[in-house]
Amino acid sequence: DIIVISDHLKPETNRQLAQYPITLLQARFKKSSKMKSVKSAISQLQEGQYDIVLIMNADNVVDTNFLEVVNNTYASGSNAIQTHRIYQERPSNVSILNAITDEINNSILRAGHVNLGLSASLNGSGTAIDFTWFKENIRHLKDDDDEKVIESLLLRERIYVEYLNNTHVYALKNSGKKKFYTQHSTWIKTQYYSLFTNIGNLPGAILSGKFDYADRILQWFIFPRTILLGILLLFSFLSVYFHWSACLKWWGLLLTFLLTMAIATPNYLVDSKFNKAMKAIPFLAAGMIFNMLLRKKK
């Protein structure tokens, strides 16, 4: 069954959606959030009504065998599954950078982790979770929580997140600069919120053998890549004016970071638009920092 949460959509859009064989839930939240919409939908479903809940964004498109692959993976014993999201349309620098960020996360935090025997991270769309577990736990979450909170709950219970690298979710929607700044500011905020709410559990996670959970907490310690790149660039150039050994260290760290990002970026993204998007990074990073400072003042 397909359930669509319509929050502040236009009446004509709702009329079009109502013609499809779906369950349409219309809502007009004062403060909209993805978690609030998901909680609203799940609350109207009965216990044991389904086996799996699959979370998708409105712009997502999947292959014809997508549900079959997810169902077979669930039947094999995986209670939490993350599929491979791909940005299908990349007309702007922002959409290209979003695609690169997503694929780096797919390479390191999902495929890389699974290859090492560690749990994959969730990305908020194309995510399948056992229905009974999800319905029981979703009601305890706040309206502004995101997939990181769901992830921490799964890992606390030793529920492994499987990653299906060859099962794709295609994202079609393109975001502008304003949404880019807001989105990345929110990601940074939720990362450190997740860190501060889980850091006290780190010693217990290590001692009790919950290594997936401990690994995720340690990940949240690391600066977001945009900020980390800025720090490495700043100290690399400043170190030139100090001792040569400090210069070697910082330039070595910078080159290692850039090499890691290059290896994690798939070949299909390295096209004629790639270099142009790379040149836009300093301006987008500066805009993001300015946007964060402006929001704090407000």
Predicted features by range, described:
Residues 1-6, 24:
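Hydrophobic targeting segments
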Residues 151-170:
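Catalytic donor-sugar/metal-binding loop of nucleotide-sugar-dependent glycosyltransferases
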Residues 26-37, 47, 69-143, 185, ...:
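Long helical/loop segments within the catalytic core of UDP-sugar-dependent glycosyltransferases
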Residues 53:
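Short aromatic/hydrophobic "clamp" motif used to bind/position activated sugar donors
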Residues 116-117, 175-261, 265-282:
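Basic/Trp-rich segment in TM-proximal cytosolic loops or flexible interdomain/linker regions
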Residues 144-150:
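Acidic donor-binding loop at a coil-to-helix junction in glycosyltransferase catalytic cores
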Residues 12, 57-72:
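Acidic donor-binding/catalytic loop of UDP-sugar-dependent glycosyltransferases
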Residues 6-13, 28-31, 61:
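A conserved acidic beta->alpha catalytic loop
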